[in-house]
Amino acid sequence: MIHSFVFSEGKLVSRDLELEALRLVHGDKGLILWVDLDQPTEEEIKLILEGVFNFHPLAIEDCVTPSSLPKIEDYEDYLFMVTHAVDFSRTDKFATTELDLFLGKEFLVTFHRSPLRSVATALERITKSTARGPDRLAHTLLDHLVDNYQPVMDELRAELEELEENVLARDSAQQKLVNELLSVRGDFSRLRTIVRPQRDVIDRLARGDSKFIRPLLLPYFRDLRDNLARLEDTAVNYHERLMMAFDIYLNKAAFEANEGIKFLTALTAVTLPAVLVGGWYGMNFEHMPELKSPHGYYYACGLTLLSTLLMVVYLKRKRWF
């Protein structure tokens, strides 16, 4: 689906143009054009990216091919950016969808394979307020994109706190707890993998060495970079807490295993006197004085009970029970 918006002197003057009208507007130096490709078909991709804007083949290839990491490329006439936005339409705890941007002096082209809340919010905002250029539009999009990471962070923090409580609980299901720990660890690893390169992309825009970003917008991009830096620091902190919880779980599991081994060892030690006495009198010798004694059975039972009792007292003092 193709959405298009035309701005003149900061005001929205037209939207959802036909293909030929898009070509004319793109060639008009006095107008600002934003084209949003939302889940486009192959034909729409070719018509817009190649037909209207004539983007570099490598940029188009990077756009249509999913990329796991954010990046930015300068193609002289425009900047090409790969970013990742939170995908709220999926059921995963943390999932992202790629949002690609082509930023020129008088145009902005966005491309995404799934509906994005950040794009929808930006569209609603520009229809109600004044848009002042492609760089301002790009900042608005990226600002909403970064803001949408906060609900994910809050959800992951809540899951982390719940896991920390379950790790210390005595009756927690071990296999389920391990699966949850590994799942949340994967979410945090994914988040850190995305946030750091995305911060580098924004940092390059905030430096002031790009002709596509006006100086008056640099403080806004620097603020965006700082927000991503705080997001990264928070993700690192949560990841460290998660690894600490994982270490506590492993130590707890090892302790519980040792307690089980300790109990079995104590049980073996308690039965050892009976085994020794039974083995002694079970030897196949013809001449054993105790075998002829009328009280031999009682002696053997008494010796067994006394040895067992002494073993129990000893293990009690060692706190094996």
PLM regions with names:
Residues 226-321:
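Hydrophobic alpha-helical transmembrane segments and their immediately adjacent juxtamembrane loops
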Residues 1-216, 220-223, 227-237, 290-292, ...:
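Peripheral, non-transmembrane regulatory/ligand-interaction domains of membrane transport proteins
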